[in-house]
Amino acid sequence: MKTLQRTLSIIKPDAVEKNAEGDIISILLNNNFRILGIKMLHLTKNQAEGFYAVHANKPFFHSLTDFMASGPIVVMCLEKENAIADYRKLMGATNPANAEEGTIRKKWAASIEKNAVHGSDADDTARFELSYFFAGYELAR
């Protein structure tokens, strides 16, 4: 029996500004991700700070949360076997200069901060992140 895993994907303001959402979603579907929930929204600074609270004491916290509140984002709940690892591989390295050819960040990211997409890094993180943006009833079964 297959064990399906869920992960959060965020298409960040820089990629939305480049109108990359459709291309990124196509990449996800072509890599057998199932989209259980999707929405476009514009975070407030407080919402961005709540989402990234784990980084509150890091030097990049304020610039990151300012950036994440600077424009619309697309949040998705993705599902497949090994969803977290597979999505992180598709995203590419956090620093787009180190990202492999063919990855989302290599194509659309400009810098470590403006790096086009976010993805959960572990099961517990995914649970928190998904619940931050989606109520259970908002996700397809």
From Swiss-Prot:
Quote the CDD domains the UniProt record gives. Answer: NDPk_I (cd04413)
Q: Where in the cell is it found?
A: Cytoplasm
GO CC entries: cytoplasm
Similarity comment: family membership? Belongs to the NDK family.
State whether keyword Transferase applies. yes
Q: Which GO terms describe its molecular function?
A: ATP binding; metal ion binding; nucleoside diphosphate kinase activity
* Organism listed in the record: Koribacter versatilis (strain Ellin345)
Q: Which Pfam families match?
A: NDK (PF00334)
Query: Which residue positions are annotated as catalytic?
Result: 118 (pros-phosphohistidine intermediate)
Q: Which PANTHER family match?
A: NUCLEOSIDE DIPHOSPHATE KINASE (PTHR46161), NUCLEOSIDE DIPHOSPHATE KINASE DDB_G0292928-RELATED (PTHR46161:SF3)
Reaction(s) this enzyme catalyzes, per UniProt: a 2'-deoxyribonucleoside 5'-diphosphate + ATP = a 2'-deoxyribonucleoside 5'-triphosphate + ADP; a ribonucleoside 5'-diphosphate + ATP = a ribonucleoside 5'-triphosphate + ADP
Q: What is this protein called?
A: Nucleoside diphosphate kinase
Keywords in alphabetical order, please: ATP-binding, Cytoplasm, Kinase, Magnesium, Metal-binding, Nucleotide metabolism, Nucleotide-binding, Phosphoprotein, Transferase
Q: What is the lineage of its organism?
A: Bacteria, Pseudomonadati, Acidobacteriota, Terriglobia, Terriglobales
Entry function: Major role in the synthesis of nucleoside triphosphates other than ATP. The ATP gamma phosphate is transferred to the NDP beta phosphate via a ping-pong mechanism, using a phosphorylated active-site intermediate.
Q: Give the record's GO biological process terms.
A: CTP biosynthetic process; GTP biosynthetic process; UTP biosynthetic process
Indicate yes or no for the key word ATP-binding. Answer: yes
Residues recorded as binding ATP, renumbered to this chain, are 12, 60, 88, 94, 105, 115
Top-rank taxon of the source lineage equals Bacteria
| Named cofactor requirement(s) | Mg(2+)
UniProt subunit comment:
Homotetramer.
